[in-house]
């Protein structure tokens, strides 16, 4: 039996699942992650908190299914969209991550949309 872990780093929280190769769920864990809104239109998260929260979820999976966790063959990851996470040269987080739903550049986006057909240029509309 092959075992795998799936981890989803979502805007509202971290979710982890331990599954058997036939998609049978062995264990599930989730933990919320707070979104900071220091000003109107801002949406940020503490990227260091993501790491500790992932480990919390993995610890819960291990507590629920220790033998299965020891036999994991792979880990799949998914994450939120477009989070701007700034790191120094050692990998240390420099500031809270600016999330995909942060609206502080709304006016600039409107100007770009009016000047350029961004969907044709980039394949994505902000």
Q: Which sequence ranges carry the predicted segments?
A:
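Short glycine-rich, Thr/Ser-proximal phosphate-binding strand/loop in the N-terminal lobe
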Residues: 4, 9-47, 92-100
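Intrinsic disorder/low-complexity segments
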Residues: 3, 48, 63-66
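Glycine-rich phosphate-binding/catalytic subdomain of phosphoryl-transfer
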Residues: 56-126
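Charged catalytic carboxylate motif
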Residues: 49, 53
